[in-house]
UniProtKB/Swiss-Prot annotation:
GO terms for biological process: translation. This is Small ribosomal subunit protein uS5. PANTHER family: MITOCHONDRIAL RIBOSOMAL PROTEIN S5. The N-terminal domain interacts with the head of the 30S subunit; the C-terminal domain interacts with the body and contacts protein S4. The interaction surface between S4 and S5 is involved in control of translational fidelity. HAMAP family: Ribosomal_uS5_B. NCBIfam families: rpsE_bact. With S4 and S12 plays an important role in translational accuracy. Located at the back of the 30S subunit body where it stabilizes the conformation of the head with respect to the body.
Length: 190
């Protein structure tokens, strides 16, 4: 029991639940205050990103008087807001994309195998829980964790797999991939 905590904690590492396939990461904890007649009532707000490392990811926000309860609420909110993101070869993005939320902008670039996750702060948590292994990301503008996570999700929402592009254009995936200039022609459509 000495090395294992039963509740909460601020270790910022991945906490895997016993009976779940999801991995969750605590992105940010903020102490908030509500001003009442008798003074200030303090609480905590938590931002959590959750994913199955196979292409599903979500984020949630929770507020409570205690940190573990705020994290639990944020995790439940993230589980309700899961989205599926198509990955190329199960390790990177299909194409370069940009996203924005408020004053925060993010640019995400697909990367060759072995590059790793080159991203800062909240974006790294999203990519690790999503299952992306190779990506280069840059954030410009707001460094607020909430805006960065929402901008990253906005970018991921605009990503298209070759299969969906081919279906939209009413052509075959092989025809679409043969048109690619340079790069690898044997891209696996997911």
């Amino acid at each position: 029991m000495a090395g294992e905590r039963e509740r909460g904690g601020r270790d910022r590492g991945p906490r895997e639940e016993r009976d779940s396939e999801f991995v969750d990461k605590l992105v940010h904890i903020n102490r908030v205050a509500k001003v009442v007649k008798g003074g200030k009532r303090f609480g905590f707000a938590a931002l959590v990103v959750i994913g199955d490392q196979k292409g599903r990811v979500g984020f949630g926000h929770g507020k409570a008087r205690e940190v573990p309860e705020a994290i639990r609420k944020a995790t439940e909110s993230a589980k309700r807001n899961l989205t599926r993101v198509p990955l190329r070869e199960g390790r990177t993005l299909h194409h370069d994309i940009a996203g924005r939320h408020g004053a925060g902008r993010v640019y995400l670039r697909a990367a060759p195998a072995g590059t790793g996750i080159i991203a800062g702060g909240p974006m790294r948590a999203v990519f690790e829980t999503l299952g992306i292994q190779d990506v280069v990301a840059k954030s410009i503008g707001s460094s607020n964790p909430y805006n960065m996570v929402r901008a990253t999700f906005d970018a991921l929402k605009h990503q298209d797999s070759p299969r969906s592009v081919a279906a939209r254009r009413n052509i075959k995936v092989s025809t679409l991939q043969s048109r690619r200039v340079g790069g690898d022609a044997e891209v696996v459509a997911e």
